Each structure stands twice: as structure tokens, then as C-alpha cells.
Amino acid sequence: MTALNDGWFTEVFQDQGTAFSLQVKRKLHEEQTPFQKLEIYETETFGNLMVLDGCVMLTTRDNFLYHEMMTHPALFTHKNPKKVVIIGGGDCGTLKEVLKHPGVEEAWQVEIDERVTRMSEKYFPEPVSYTHLTLPTTPYV
């Protein structure tokens, strides 16, 4: 369950008895894609916030933490990673981290919802632009 009340976006986790809230300056974007509801907010302290179907996906301020932890443990424990496939990851943050590994020769990103990637280009440009500058031939499916 999520709510936007009195300038706060709140994601509530009833089963765990917890909630996560960010103070919102304004809503930047909202659309219903063929796959999910996509919302982008500008927050007071965490930069932009992406929400999919009411669930927080990333913020400008802390997205690197999520992507680093998803990527580096797997690639550092693999003997010699050369080819990587990322399922999802439309904001391109995981792809950005994968491309930091010099042994990776191919990286494929498969994202069902192109709108997530397009809105990431607009509102979270750093991970997306990094991936294009690092490996311009990276395929997006």
C-alpha cells in the first residue's frame, strides 16, 4: 500500500509493521504503461524517486547501493565473467556496474517495459548515459 499525503510519499509494509516515507516536492511524471504504473517524484532530500506499481524502485541519491550489491558479488565470485544478461534493470544501473568489469565482453539487458528506460534517460540520466558512453553497442532487448 502506498500513499501521497501532505507532501509525503509513503510505502507501507503491513505484514512487517513498517513504512518508508520521503518528503515530496512535486510529481514529475505519471503514466500507466502496458505493464505497470510508473511514477516519478522530485523529493526534498533523495533527488528523484521512481515508483512502479506503488513500490519504490530507486532514488537519485541511493540507487548505486542497490546496483552495486546486485552486481559485484556475482561478478567477483565468478572465475572469468565474459557474457552477462540482465533481466529487467530498465534504469540501467545494474548494466552500469557490470560494465565496470574489464573482463566482460558482452552485456545484454532485457527489459519488458521500455518506458522505464525512457523515463530513466530523462529523470535518472547518470546510469543510462554511462552505459552508452562505456559500451555504445550494448544491446537492449
Enumerate the predicted regions with their spans:
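The AdoMet/dcAdoMet-binding core of the Class I SAM-like
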Residues: 2-9, 58-133
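Single conserved hydrophobic/aromatic residue that forms the stacking wall/gate
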Residues: 132, 137-141
